[in-house]
Amino acid sequence: MNALDRVRVLDFTTTIAGPHCTRLMADLGAEVIKIEAPEGDMMRSRLPLRNGASTSFGQLNTGKKSLVLDLKRPEAVAVVQRLVKTADVVVENFRPGVMARFGLDYQSLRPHNPALVYCAISGYGQTGPSAGRPAYAPVIHASSGYDLAQIAHQLEPRAPDFCGIFIADVLTGTYAFGAVMAAPVAWRCTSARRPAPGS
């Protein structure tokens, strides 16, 4: 028996942070359904490739089921609305406002499943002046001061050394996983239902 057996997760994430979060859930036994656009997650083409498939994509998405849906189409939204009735968790990492435009944000899905845990991962939060800014790990490394800290440990002054591990993505995915796992405990203690913060 795994800790998350019988837990169903709808995974709308791409690249690294979100898939890392949902991979941790799959590792604990959750049924994770990765929902991809017809063009697929950009990580599918990330090098290195083995037998034509990205090893990075495989590492981040092993143990998950896959479903292709064009969320711009009403019939695809209807499929998600049906799936969410039996889901426990939704994780997404679109820019703030994208899921609302699809009609798939927390407020839109909650009537279909009031017990749903919804985690929206973003680089600069869901609200505020920088919310709409795109954020990949190298951007966050620079804006957070991580790169500056790296420079302090270099022997000569130059641009920061490239970080082979996208620390910002791994930490974001790990903290998002923790937020999702903590949500039911918080609800038991407060009787308040709200999205799990993932920014």
Locations of regions flagged by a protein language model:
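N-terminal helix-loop segment corresponding to the beta1-alpha1 unit
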Residues: 1-188, 192-194
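Beta-strand segments within the central parallel beta-sheet cores of soluble alpha/beta enzyme folds
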Residues: 195-199
